[in-house]
């Protein structure tokens, strides 16, 4: 009887201890052309950014970042690919970007993540590696902008930051 009890106890302990962790959520926010003191999480008082501060406190706050290419589209290509501009081929804001190359979103998809890109991308072509995309073609407009939503052009009434925030939150839900 003791052997049976020990066997059953071992069985429940073994199967009760299985790994049940889920991968962490990743929210990557990239902003253009702001000074280091524009986000209050970095300890400067220029702007109060309580929501970004909360995200930084609960997640990660990068305090030592280095830019390999500080030009708009090339910097995005570097972020997507992890490769210097002279390797990923996007060295200026004019030439096309090769979406066929590997990027971090494609890698995240291979391990089960759902991926989305919302906002200004400034890379020609349709984003690849994303389950959902709502991007501004080119520079975009601040009011009543056209978006490419999963490749379909749609004009949305309103201010671009408000629209981008809403599209992002709708997808996250």
Protein language model regions, located:
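Formylglycine-dependent sulfatase
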Residues: 2-4, 17-173
